[in-house]
Amino acid sequence: MIYETAPAKINLTLDTLFKRDDGYHEIAMIMTTVDLNDRLSFQKRKDKKIVVDIEHNYVPNDHKNLAYRAAQLMMETYDLNEGVTITIDKDIPVSAGLAGGSADAAATMRGINRLFNLDKSLHELSDLGIQIGTDIPFCIYNRTAVCKGRGEKIRFLKKPPSAWVVLAKPNLGISSADVFKALDLDDAHHVDTEMCEKAIVEGDYKQLCESLSNRLEPVSMSMHPEIKKIKNNMLQCGADGALMSGSGPTVYGLAQKESQAKKIYNAVNGCCNEVYLVRLLG
């Protein structure tokens, strides 16, 4: 049996530049990981089936599951003659903007690579993974990075300054497609990705917090005002910086001191069912 860990990601920045001819948006973003993980195990089957074993009411176990699709892609690409059972122990909240599904898919690709002794590089897996999800290339590596294009153009950065992270997911669902559809690409405001990168390179925690930015945030907030309330609550309770991750709805707050982070955690715990106190991994 093979084991893999799938950490959640957060966006430190997210900018949308223009809509491409293929229908996707050209993006530029900086992402990193936190120590909130799904855990996966992989075991060969003789019947060539893909079986996803997951005890979660809101997560499918068929082709709608990204881990299933990742396994299917690996089996078809590398002509595997055995199946696989994938067991997922899930802690990352679903439809949260934390790339939980993409992290599971990336872990599945790494796991099958090891299980079947395919000896494929992470670069090869990343190039393959973009076929089923824009966050999968980043999740293959699980390293702080600038991601451009659809997410497949990756440039690694050093780890960001250490910090506590409070993650809060409000009790609502959000459609990434609806958020991108509502985005005004003629809006002149763009995210300063370079400022955030400079803060990471120089280890400047204060500048990092000041440079957190997500072009999708005001769009999601206009659809769901609860997101803005959570962010404001975090900042009022002492977060050094706060931002919505991805297309939402999860908001995170950064703090250098554990006592500070616990205060933020307690402040938002009453209004959200899913609140986590974790650390930056990078």
From Swiss-Prot:
Its EC number is 2.7.1.148. This is Putative 4-diphosphocytidyl-2-C-methyl-D-erythritol kinase. Belongs to the GHMP kinase family. IspE subfamily. The active site is at K9, D135. One of its GO terms (molecular function) is 4-(cytidine 5'-diphospho)-2-C-methyl-D-erythritol kinase activity. GO terms for biological process: terpenoid biosynthetic process. PANTHER family: 4-DIPHOSPHOCYTIDYL-2-C-METHYL-D-ERYTHRITOL KINASE, CHLOROPLASTIC. It comes from the Bacteria. Catalyzes the phosphorylation of the position 2 hydroxy group of 4-diphosphocytidyl-2C-methyl-D-erythritol. Keywords: ATP-binding, Kinase, Nucleotide-binding, Transferase. Signal peptide: none annotated. ATP binds at P93, V94, S95, A96, G97, L98, A99, G100, G101, S102, A103. It catalyses: 4-CDP-2-C-methyl-D-erythritol + ATP = 4-CDP-2-C-methyl-D-erythritol 2-phosphate + ADP + H(+). InterPro entries: GHMP_kinase_C_dom, GHMP_kinase_C_sf, GHMP_kinase_N_dom, IspE, Ribosomal_Su5_D2-typ_SF, Ribsml_uS5_D2-typ_fold_subgr. It comes from Staphylococcus haemolyticus (strain JCSC1435).
